[in-house]
């Protein structure tokens, strides 16, 4: 399920859409990831190892590795403390897998699923972004106002960024790993942190719109992404069912707003930067801000998902992959 364990947003499994042909529905890949009662569990994250030709799906209880050619589950591993939204190293070998809002992350071997190291000392582990250099991992603890940075050579925390105005929720980083764009509890807006010094640089509030109750996640702006060219920041607004667009260059001018059909709680982009994928199920043209279509499954049911990733194939194998997070890609 793309949102919690609700089957009304596209059902169970991995849904495949053809980006080159109008995002038409292609197929549904069968997955595991079940609650103890046998019903589909909440999907917490999705990530790809191009090197291993595998896609990984985390649920509340487990992590699955699925071969992208055979579309078969290679293994499913249960983890003590559960699983949350993970991230994989650029070489496709190592994963940082948060526990389910417990006090630790597991560093996991992507080939075997074995735990390499446990990193503890947190309150509620949740979101994870592996930096483009492969040297740092950015870790969001939703019980702390800090964004944590781990050194991947030692798997030890080497920096805290913040403190921010509230507990850190979804965030993103630029390609050069100098800036972090962070959403926090209670703020309809985002904050900016310096990933080298650890200092908070800016706090931005959405102008012209009021906060209100949201059905999921509890914070007003659950979802933020950088366009791949790093020119813009797209911010989710659940209550007002909007995407707010900002310049990604200080002073981060608010540019426009785009209405959605449901409460967006996540956003990512295509690798080429042409398409935005909010979790409410629309495909948005980044340049024109127009909603091009709404994703539908094989039964013509509306599809919504907070776990979306682009994969490019050649001769049946993955050659390039995007990210569930809308991370910067400007080199």
Question: Predicted regions: what is each one?
Answer:
Residues 1-331:
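Predominantly soluble domains enriched in secretory-pathway, periplasmic, or organellar proteins
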């Amino acid at each position: 399920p793309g949102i919690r364990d609700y089957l009304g947003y596209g059902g169970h499994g991995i849904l495949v859409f053809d980006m080159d042909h109008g995002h038409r529905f292609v197929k549904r890949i069968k997955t595991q990831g079940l609650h103890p009662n046998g019903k589909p569990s909440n999907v917490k994250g999705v990530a790809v190892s191009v090197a291993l030709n595998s896609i990984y799906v985390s649920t509340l209880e487990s992590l699955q590795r699925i071969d992208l050619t055979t579309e078969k589950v290679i293994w499913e591993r249960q983890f003590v403390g559960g699983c949350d939204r993970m991230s994989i190293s650029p070489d496709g070998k190592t994963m940082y897998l948060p526990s389910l809002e417990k006090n630790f992350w597991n560093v996991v071997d992507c080939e075997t699923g074995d735990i390499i190291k446990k990193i503890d000392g947190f309150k509620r582990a949740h979101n994870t972004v592996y930096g483009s250099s492969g040297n740092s991992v950015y870790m969001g603890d939703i019980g702390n106002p800090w964004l944590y940075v781990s050194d991947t050579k030692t798997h030890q925390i080497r920096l805290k960024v913040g403190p921010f105005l509230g507990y850190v929720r979804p965030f993103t980083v630029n390609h050069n790993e100098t800036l972090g764009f962070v959403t926090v509890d209670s703020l309809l807006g985002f904050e900016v942190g310096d990933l080298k010094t650890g200092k908070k640089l800016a706090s931005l509030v959405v102008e012209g719109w009021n906060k209100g109750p949201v059905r999921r996640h509890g914070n007003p702006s659950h979802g933020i992404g950088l366009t791949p060219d790093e020119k813009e920041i797209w911010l989710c607004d659940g209550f007002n069912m909007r995407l707010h667009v900002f310049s990604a260059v200080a002073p981060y001018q608010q540019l426009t707003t785009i209405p959605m059909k449901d409460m967006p709680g996540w956003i990512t982009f295509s690798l080429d930067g042409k398409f935005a994928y909010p979790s409410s199920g629309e495909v948005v043209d980044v340049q024109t801000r127009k909603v091009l279509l709404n994703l539908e499954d094989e039964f013509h049911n509306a599809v919504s998902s907070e776990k979306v990733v682009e994969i490019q194939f050649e001769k049946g194998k993955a050659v390039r992959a995007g990210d569930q997070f809308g991370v910067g890609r400007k080199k």
